[in-house]
Curated annotation (Swiss-Prot):
It is a multi-pass membrane protein. GO terms for cellular component: plasma membrane. The lineage of its organism: Archaea, Methanobacteriati, Methanobacteriota, Methanomada group, Methanococci. Keywords: Cell membrane, Membrane, Transmembrane, Transmembrane helix. This is Uncharacterized protein MJ0545. It is found in: Cell membrane. The chain crosses the membrane at residues 8-28, 229-249. It comes from the Archaea. Its main location: membrane.
């Protein structure tokens, strides 16, 4: 019974020992950096492995449908025992989304081909489109220009309302002057000039001169105000025209 147990245990231990040695040799350190990146950014796969014994035809291949590597294969005809293999695979991210990088490792030991595969995860992101930002800026600029035009229209209407009564008053005053002149001419009798009439005429003339002077001053003030309003209106129209030209140039 004991002999039979030895016959079973010894081959099992030998098989386990043989199995563990290749497994130890097939566990390299593999790192992908960065794990998250933008499209067209660089991606690096760092491979590091120490051979516990002599191997032949050592080969490492890196594959991915989302990353294009400049050189995806590492090959050595032989690796000595306890030798360290270190290599960096450089690539470029081309496809957005969550993807995997496939690392395949193979070598020959004592005429036996050993293969191993490792999967690494990577997330590739895309930048937001700028068209939405441009659309919002255009919308806000149109609102500002509309508000500016409305304010300028209100100012123009108020200026027109202020200017019109002054011009009308000037015309009415000029009409009154003409009527006063006519009435004075009719009331003066050349044949009956007396001292009292002379005094009355002097008073009438004085009132006429005062009225004429005051009316002329009012007309001059109104004209001055009109020129000031025209200047302000021209300045406002010039500013509006400048905004319109700048808006057209930016578009």
């Amino acid at each position: 019974m004991v002999g039979k147990m030895k016959k079973v245990i010894i081959p099992l231990l030998i098989s386990l020992f043989i199995f563990l040695i290749p497994n130890y040799a097939l566990n390299p350190e593999i790192i992908v950096t960065p794990e998250k990146c933008l499209v067209n950014n660089s991606v690096y796969v760092i491979f590091q492995w120490r051979a516990p014994y002599n191997v032949e035809d050592f080969n490492v291949t890196v594959l991915s449908d989302a990353v294009v590597f400049k050189n995806s294969t590492l090959y050595y005809a032989g690796v000595a025992e306890d030798a360290k293999v270190f290599h960096i695979f450089e690539g470029e991210a081309v496809t957005p989304g969550n993807h995997t990088i496939n690392v395949q490792m193979s070598y020959i030991i004592d005429g036996t081909l050993i293969k191993k595969k490792f999967l690494l995860n990577i997330s590739i992101l895309t930048l937001p489109e700028n068209i939405y930002v441009s659309y919002n800026n255009t919308y806000n600029r149109d609102e500002e220009n509309t508000s500016l035009l409305e304010n300028i229209t209100k100012i123009f209407e108020n200026t027109t309302n202020v200017t019109t009564p002054n011009s009308t008053n000037a015309i009415i005053n000029e009409t009154n002057i003409t009527q006063n002149k006519t009435n004075i001419s009719k009331n003066i009798d050349i044949g009956n000039i007396t001292k009292a009439n002379t005094t009355s005429q002097e008073k009438i003339t004085q009132k006429f001169n005062n009225t004429s002077t005051q009316t002329i001053e009012n007309v001059q003030k109104d004209k001055g105000n009109n020129w000031l309003m025209y200047g302000i209106l021209g300045l406002i129209i010039g500013i509006v025209f400048g905004f319109v030209v700048m808006y057209i140039i930016k578009i």
